Structure formats: C-alpha cells, structure tokens
Amino acid sequence: SGYTEALTDPSFKGQILMSTYPLEGNYGVSEEWYQSDKVQVEGFVVREACKKLSNFGTKKTLDDFLKEFKVPGIEDIDTRDLTLKIREKGSLKAALATEEIDDDELVARAQEHKSIIDLDLVPLVSTPELKTFGDFDKTVAILDCGVKKNIINCFLENDIGVALFPYDTDYQTILDYGVNGLMVSPGPGNPERLTETIANVEKLLNRFPIFGICMGQHVIAKTFGGIKKKS
C-alpha cells in the first residue's frame, strides 16, 4: 500500500497520517490507486515531499492531490523521532495550521479536540444506501464501516458478488437479501461506539460464515463479549 492508498483509506478518517518513509510523492498520484472517492485523512506529515514526478503514467503531484481535497500537509518533520514518541505514548492529539498562529493557541486547540475514541467516524464514511457489485452465483454482504475499494475488488476477482450495506443495517434486511456470507469491514475510530452494528451482527451469528477485517474483527469479538486491549 502506497501513500495514495493510505490517504484515501476510510480507516484513517479523523486522523493526521504520518509516513516514516523519508520521501513521499516521487511517483505521483493516480485515481486508479484511490481506495475511496477522496482523501480521508485530516492531514499528512512527511520528512520530505517530492516535487518532481518520476513516473510517466501520472501527472498529479502529492501537493496537487492534497490541495485538490483541501487537506493540509507538512514536511521537514523528523518523522523517525516523532514515530518513537508516538510508539511510546500512543496516538496523540495534534493540529496543523495553514496560517500564522501562536504555538500555545494551536496546542490549546488540539487539546480541546475530542479524543478519537469519543468520535463517531463510521457514519461519515459508510455508504448511505445499499450498493451491489458483480453478478455471480455467490454473494457476500459487507457491513460498510469504511471499506476499501480493493477489498471489494478481491471478491469480484474471485467471482463473488458484493452487497454493500450501511453499517447500521438491520439484521433482518441482510437475511432477507439472501447472501452466502457476511464481512464486517475495516473502519475508523472506536468499535465500541458501534452498538447497533454489534447487536445486528450478534443476531446473524450461525446463519452463515462471518468474518471481519481490522475494526470488523473487533465488532465480531464484541458479540462474544470480548474486550480490546493493546499489547
């Protein structure tokens, strides 16, 4: 996964993304790499942003890409050092300014912002209505907590259709649709806030194969009374 895929990944909604690789943007940006229809992150932090493309197949720079979606980026940051701090302390509140502002005021704004565990981010990235992909003998339902395009493509490449449901779809609606399995997708934020999704998945247990990726695994674990804990 490259920077284009990461920046358009709905799982990073509500977060400032930082790259540990020292140079980003050298091969440009192409829409074929998008994992959603827009940049999902709130900001991008890099050591150096390449200004000259080294890819004949792209014409859009990383800077152009971020500006297109009005997402701030910052370079000349010691990302290796910052990574060590985040590794020790965990995710930290942060803010990026696009104009002159007092340092203390910017820090205060960041501190006033809600923690990511208290934000409802999944509704911002989930499909608002049912969408279908492919016409095959078997179909998998995906509860869309922030699915990436590549996940859908993997099913289609294996001759499996996809019925993409909003994250809060009632379990009976999924049963009535008649699918062969259920996947709970990745997504941003705190899975414990998805009480409705957890309740619906619990009612679908033992009806057909169920699996999840990232946040989806946490949702399924919650239906069995599991708790999440960082090791």
Question: In which residue ranges do the predicted regions lie?
Answer:
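RNA-binding accessory domains that recognize and position tRNA/RNA substrates
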Residues: 1-172, 176-177, 191
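Cysteine-nucleophile active-site neighborhood
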Residues: 176-231
